[in-house]
Regions:
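Blade/loop signatures of beta-propeller domains
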Residues: 49-50
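Short interaction-prone segments
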Residues: 65-67
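Enriched for short, Lys/Arg-rich terminal
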Residues: 1-15, 24-41, 55, 61, ...
Length: 97
């Protein structure tokens, strides 16, 4: 029973917020490379369930983007997002931070 409480405390319901630049990046991937677009959706789903572990090698960012996290979309491109207690802000899905 104690284990159940720990699990429920770790998983929080957060609202996913998609910033305009992120939506534009997703549109780009749908038009240019649907395979990468599908991977982006997998990373969004994984990041929404557990923002700090899972697929895409999640890592905390430093310096100007301290507090943000990234997941590897391709060798060159990353999904960047901010996590708070109540929401996950998806900021970009192209380029590196």
């Amino acid at each position: 029973m104690a284990r159940e409480n720990k699990t429920s405390q770790k998983k929080k319901d957060r609202i996913a917020v998609f910033h305009p630049e992120f939506v534009e990046d997703l549109r780009f991937w749908v038009e240019q490379d649907r395979k990468i677009a599908l991977k982006a959706f997998d990373l969004i789903e994984s990041g929404s369930c557990d923002p700090f572990s899972g697929i895409g090698k999640p890592e905390p960012l430093k310096y100007l983007l301290a507090g943000a996290w990234s997941r590897r979309l391709t060798q060159e491109h990353r999904i960047v997002y901010l996590v708070s207690d109540t929401r996950i802000d998806f900021l970009q899905a192209r380029y590196q931070y």
